[in-house]
Design a protein with these regions (language model features):
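A ligand-binding cleft/hinge motif common to bilobed small-molecule-binding domains
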Residues: 25, 29-40, 125, 130-149
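Generic non-transmembrane alpha-helical segments
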Residues: 1, 179-191
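Extracytoplasmic small-molecule ligand-binding "clamshell" domains
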Residues: 1-35
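Periplasmic-binding protein-like
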Residues: 46-61, 147-184, 197-210
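Hydrophobic residues within well-ordered alpha-helices
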Residues: 19, 78, 124-125
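Bilobed "Venus flytrap"/periplasmic-binding protein-like clamshell domains
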Residues: 56-120, 190-202, 209-215
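A basic- and aromatic-enriched beta-loop-alpha substructure that forms the phosphate/nucleotide-
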Residues: 26-62
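Hydrophobic, well-ordered secondary-structure segments
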Residues: 95-104, 109, 113-126, 147-149, ...
């Protein structure tokens, strides 16, 4: 397709460095760091469609999770709860729940930084935190974990663009989209079914026009 690319992947480069690299061929980025730091400096290609129930193609939402014996019936009931979040620049774990809360006149506080969605679920299950927001796809993948027996879902966030594929700035999107679609066609059906990987969606730029949350230091 006329796309110059190295023979192998660089497994050592930090993802934040990779997204900003002038030779970036293809990257997958969460929409919060994309909006916060990279939107004007990359070529946006498409969003991945994981067939999230209740969300449009190419979009996703997070589910609010509390302990299974918690009396909260909705996230509003948990307004003063300690929020476990994976990363401050995670839309699913931090940005989306805080924007959902802001639309209802509050912010989740205090916080607990866990570095991973699964760690956030464990923090809630073990009582170290009171609530967390987990992207619906990850929650589905982790559905059989034993710790899931100790938590329950009490709500969901608004829909936002799913994991987004990007390349370096100034590139023609067309050959990349053709190559990505052909690569997805070559993935065995069983694997796509296991991941619920339906394909890619070209979203309008306006889909990413979402208010920025206050990012914790």
């Amino acid at each position: 397709h006329g796309i110059e690319a190295p023979e192998g992947l660089d497994h050592d480069m930090h993802h934040m460095v990779g997204w900003a690299h002038p030779d970036l061929v293809l990257g997958q980025i969460c929409n919060l760091p994309y909006r916060a730091q990279f939107r004007e400096n990359v070529t946006t290609l498409c969003a991945i469609d994981y067939e999230i129930p209740g969300s449009p193609a190419g979009f996703y939402h997070s589910v609010f999770v509390v302990r299974d014996d918690d009396p909260a019936q909705s996230p509003v009931d948990a307004a003063t709860y300690r929020l476990a979040y994976n990363e401050p620049l995670s839309n699913s774990g931090y940005g989306a729940p805080q924007l959902w809360a802001a639309s209802r006149g509050f912010q989740f506080s205090p916080f607990m930084h866990t570095h991973a969605h699964r760690n956030s679920i464990e923090a809630v299950a073990t009582g170290k935190a009171d609530i967390c927001a987990i992207d619906a796809h990850t929650f589905w993948i982790d559905r059989d974990l034993e710790l899931m027996n100790s938590v329950k879902v009490i709500g969901r966030t608004h829909d936002t663009p799913g994991m987004t594929l990007i390349t370096r700035a100034g590139q023609d999107r067309a050959p990349y989209l053709v190559a990505i679609r052909q690569a997805l066609e070559a993935v065995p059906t069983a694997i796509k079914s296991e991941l619920r990987l339906r394909g890619i969606v070209e979203l309008p730029a306006s889909a990413y026009d979402i208010p920025m949350p206050n990012i914790p230091a």
